[in-house]
């Protein structure tokens, strides 16, 4: 694992028990960890967590967003897929995005999926609703583009929008036809499927690798991904890769069938390999029966699978159901359970994250869990070590965790595997209780557990009070500042930022733009350091100079304000127009939580409004910027050191205001309310359609409402809209408007 990653101190707490602050902290930490794992999985083909671990990590993230909707925005990972394509390959834009699937881990979740589909479509229980069920292959997603029946391009999924061009490599896979055969082949079709490696072929490949003194692969998925993403197609040709087709993207003039199973049958007729274990069923019981059947056969299959995928069979119903965030409403992946293993804790180390959180990590005797070698496990926080849960309750039957203990490790949703129990009868005689440090192991500042003034409850995590004088926190801020979506200075990535900090060349963002001047005055020139030369140093200085002018939204994003991702940075940039205006608004804002501070003796002129002052209301009224984001912005600029960092940076950099964005649909950017009985679509379908067109759907009418779509039986909302002068149209007029 990467050192100094943010902790997840509340992981042992149910999401329903998290406070808003705890949820915000964990959401931010999860966002960083998931993005890191996406890069390892999709770009490096070297995941450090199992699929079950990753899936449950995603589930935790999405559950937090479901309970705290203000945390969800356009930058949320729940709206994203995969990771950006590698720079090693040419990029290919997917005409139809390659999305991922929502996951289910229990029978109840599958039954709820079926019920949810019925509710969305307003189908009676007696109405037939067919599904397909197929094994979920553990490989690398790939899109094959055929034009006139001829394979013209192949691409990985990448970030779902664009992937890597692997055409030359895919042409070496024997199972993938260069030309489709048979009747009914569409003029253009993007075949979606999975490139994988069979178990026997994987073992044989690893034997050859070991014999040749080359690194072996951890599992068949890594072997398949690494083999497909080779720069030399001849290496790919030498690897026994295979392929299953199961979906499609663009299809002109249309897909070769009216249902999922008809289209997949057509794939088989065209000469594409399809999975023989795919079936069609008509209820949840049929789905679960097939899941158990495949689970029983899993060990005997010649390839790895990690679950079963269920899809609504009718393409017409799929179209009605549409998509939500990063996945379709009409499909779900029913995943197999995670695995456990027993090992020994050799040491407990403390890592310090960007927010100062001290995270205990168990260093383990390496053990294989779920096909991945595990040597680290999270211990969450000091209470978890002491067998105390998030609400003060006893966990693990009151057995604490000590160095030397034999423990059961599980890969089931944590950032790194977690210790779930201690084998007490194997505890060494000399093992002593672990003493959690009260000082930061990096900067030696005091580490404290804060107390919530409202609840009086002590925070689960102990934090370093050193702030930016703590190298661990300062380095993380610098690494974020130079990241791809921030200043993105060529030649100055996260690794170089860390090194420059260690060499005392930079301590805060503004120092980057003073680097050349300092280098000229220094006796120890950058070009003389290991890994650098005169040309590379000059190229870096030129790249830094080119970033002295930067878009305002990138500048705001680079500051690393909690909850302010790329999209929220754009929203703030468009609204305020300058860093100074944003800073002044943050300083002048009076938050609702501060209203309680005024006593009866407080002069009326100084008392604050219960809903916050006008500056606060203006910020929270920005489309997409709620109270959680606004509070983070206010707290950032109220911290004197942060203001100083920004002021110094503004001496070196000139942020440029954003240009206005043109609307792309008649309702783009407008607030729409639906009321009454809709006859041509369900309420969920109406909301999904409006959001796809760029509108914001509200549940009530207010002065901010731009349009009310009223069906038969519209009542109080229609009356209020008329009183406010809100434009009102019928359902038919809505379809005329949006086409």
Curated annotation (Swiss-Prot):
Residues 1-29, 592-612 are annotated as: Disordered. Residues 662-739 form the BRCT domain. Zn(2+) binds at residues 440, 443, 464, 470. It comes from the Bacteria. One of its GO terms (cellular component) is cytosol. It catalyses: NAD(+) + (deoxyribonucleotide)n-3'-hydroxyl + 5'-phospho-(deoxyribonucleotide)m = (deoxyribonucleotide)n+m + AMP + beta-nicotinamide D-nucleotide. The keyword Metal-binding applies. The active site is at 136 (n6-amp-lysine intermediate). NCBIfam families: dnlj, PRK07956.1. This is DNA ligase. It comes from Azorhizobium caulinodans (strain ATCC 43989 / DSM 5975 / JCM 20966 / LMG 6465 / NBRC 14845 / NCIMB 13405 / ORS 571). The gene is ligA.
């Amino acid at each position: 694992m990467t050192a100094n990653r943010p902790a997840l101190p509340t992981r042992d707490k149910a999401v329903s028990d998290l406070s808003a602050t705890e949820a915000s902290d964990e959401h931010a930490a999860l966002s960083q960890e998931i993005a890191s794992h996406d890069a390892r999985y999709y770009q490096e083909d070297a995941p450090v967590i199992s699929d079950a671990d990753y899936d449950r990590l995603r589930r935790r993230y999405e559950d937090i967003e479901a309970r705290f909707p203000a945390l969800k925005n356009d930058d949320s990972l729940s709206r994203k897929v995969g990771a950006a394509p590698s720079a090693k390959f040419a990029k290919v834009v997917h005409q139809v995005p390659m999305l991922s699937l929502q996951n289910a881990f229990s029978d109840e979740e599958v039954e709820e999926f079926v019920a949810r589909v019925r509710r969305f479509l307003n189908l009676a229980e007696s109405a037939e609703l067919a599904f397909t069920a197929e094994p979920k292959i553990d490989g690398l997603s790939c899109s094959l583009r055929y034009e006139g029946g001829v394979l013209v391009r192949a691409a990985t999924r990448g970030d779902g929008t664009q992937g890597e061009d692997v055409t030359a490599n895919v042409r070496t896979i024997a199972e993938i036809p260069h030309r489709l055969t048979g009747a009914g082949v569409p003029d253009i079709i993007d075949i979606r499927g999975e490139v994988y490696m069979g178990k026997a072929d994987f073992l044989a490949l690893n034997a050859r690798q070991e014999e040749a003194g080359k690194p072996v692969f951890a599992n068949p998925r890594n072997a398949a991904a690494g083999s497909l993403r080779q720069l030399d197609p001849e290496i790919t040709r030498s690897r026994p890769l295979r392929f299953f087709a199961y979906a499609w993207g663009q299809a002109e003039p249309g897909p070769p069938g009216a249902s999922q199973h008809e289209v997949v049958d057509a794939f088989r007729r065209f000469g594409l390999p399809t999975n023989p274990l795919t079936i069609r069923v008509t209820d949840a019981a049929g789905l679960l029966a097939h899941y158990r059947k495949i689970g029983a056969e899993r060990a005997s299959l010649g390839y790895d699978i990690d679950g079963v995928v269920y899809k609504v069979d009718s393409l017409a119903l799929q179209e009605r159901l549409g998509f939500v965030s990063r996945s379709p409403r009409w499909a779900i992946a029913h995943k197999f359970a995670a695995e456990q293993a027993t090992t020994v804790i050799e040491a407990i180390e403390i890592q310090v994250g960007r927010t100062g959180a001290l995270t205990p990590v168990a260093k383990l005797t390496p053990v294989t869990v779920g096909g991945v070698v595990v040597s680290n496990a999270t211990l969450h926080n000091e209470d978890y070590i002491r067998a105390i849960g998030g609400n003060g309750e006893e966990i693990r039957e009151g057995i604490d965790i000590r160095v030397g203990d034999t423990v059961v490790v599980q890969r089931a949703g944590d950032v790194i595997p977690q210790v779930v129990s201690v084998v007490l009868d194997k505890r060494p005689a000399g093992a002593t209780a672990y003493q959690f440090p009260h000082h930061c192991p990096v900067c030696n500042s005091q580490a404290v557990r804060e107390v919530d003034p409202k609840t009086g409850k002590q925070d689960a995590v102990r934090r370093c009070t050193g702030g930016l004088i703590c190298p661990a926190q300062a380095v993380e801020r610098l690494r974020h500042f130079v990241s791809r979506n921030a200043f993105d200075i060529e030649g100055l990535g996260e690794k170089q930022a860390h090194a420059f900090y260690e060499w005392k060349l930079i301590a805060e963002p503004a120092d980057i733009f003073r680097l050349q001047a300092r280098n000229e005055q220094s006796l120890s020139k950058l070009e003389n350091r290991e890994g650098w030369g005169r040309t590379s140093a000059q190229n870096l200085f030129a790249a830094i100079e080119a970033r002295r002018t930067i878009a305002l939204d990138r500048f705001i994003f680079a500051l690393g304000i909690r909850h302010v991702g790329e999209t929220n940075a754009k929203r703030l940039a468009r609204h305020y127009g300058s860093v100074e205006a944003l800073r002044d608004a943050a300083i002048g804002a009076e938050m609702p939580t501060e209203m309680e501070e005024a006593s009866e003796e407080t002069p009326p002129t100084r008392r604050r409004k219960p809903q916050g002052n006008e500056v606060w209301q203006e910020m929270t009224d920005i489309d997409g910027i709620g109270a959680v984001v606004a509070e983070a912005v206010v707290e950032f600029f109220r911290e004197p050191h942060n203001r100083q960092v920004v002021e110094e940076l503004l001496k070196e950099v000139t942020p440029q205001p954003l240009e206005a964005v043109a609307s792309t649909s008649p309702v783009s950017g407008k607030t729409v309310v639906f009321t009454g009985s809709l006859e041509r679509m369900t309420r969920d379908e109406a909301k999904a359609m409006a959001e796809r067109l760029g509108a914001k759907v509200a549940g009530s009418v207010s002065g901010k409402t731009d349009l009310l779509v009223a069906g038969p039986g519209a009542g109080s909302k229609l009356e209020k809209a008329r009183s406010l002068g809100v434009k009102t149209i019928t359902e038919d007029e809505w379809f005329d408007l949006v086409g």
